[in-house]
Amino acid sequence: MKNTIDQKAREGYALELGKLIDDSFATFKKTFLVSGLGMLIVSAIMVLFYIGLMGSFFGFSNLSKTVLSIETLAKEPNFIIGSGIVSMFVSALFAPFTAGFIHLNHLAQTQKSFSIDNLFDFYKEPYYKQIFLSYLIIGGITALFTTMLSLFGYEKINTFVQIIFSLATIFTIPLIIYGKLDYTEALSKSVQLYAKQPLIILVAMLIAVIGMLLGIFILCIGIIFTVPYLYAMHYALYAQAIGFEKTAPENQEL
């Protein structure tokens, strides 16, 4: 598999936008209910985590006062730097959930059984360490750039920087869990692979965002159940760009 990845990173690969849309929607239809319920659970965990984090720094006695304290400190250099560091570790801590959401699509595509339990599969070794370290680096670099921009008064560019880093590292998790690369190789190859088809990848993810929003307004279902379409497109991109070996991880083998 490593030879295939090296070849694609070196010579390039083909992506068909129409097929990406068809494939992503096909797996989304199979996984949206489980993924949506999983998103509820993960969102609840993150909310509790952030409440605990804010409470440990600002106290639990008055939540509204805590929010006001954060708003007051938001432009303080020390707070900006501190929040960047916290964001870096939080993104790394929750990254295995991203792997779980992506993997649900693989299980559906390969006609394997899946459940909410599969969202926690990549908190196990050998995957957890590699995913955690990769997103610690991604989060660290992103936090460095966004913190510097904020300190110099260019907060409006932060979103653009975050989008660029997200797209350039889009293949990192699939390369770890399916390509069996370590975190340094996965990061490097992801950037190389993205550079071969940047426009189509950007358009595909933009379509995924639009599809997510249309699902909210047209189908009248909550964003919790439409966000997983982003992971379906994420999976479709890797599946079409790289593909899989028969030994790719299944829920029974983890």
What is the meaning of each model-derived region?
Residues 56-57, 238-239, 252-253:
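A general structural signal for short secondary-structure boundary/capping elements
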Residues 4-6, 12, 16, 244-254:
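Cytosolic juxtamembrane C-terminal amphipathic helix followed by a basic/polar low-complexity tail immediately after
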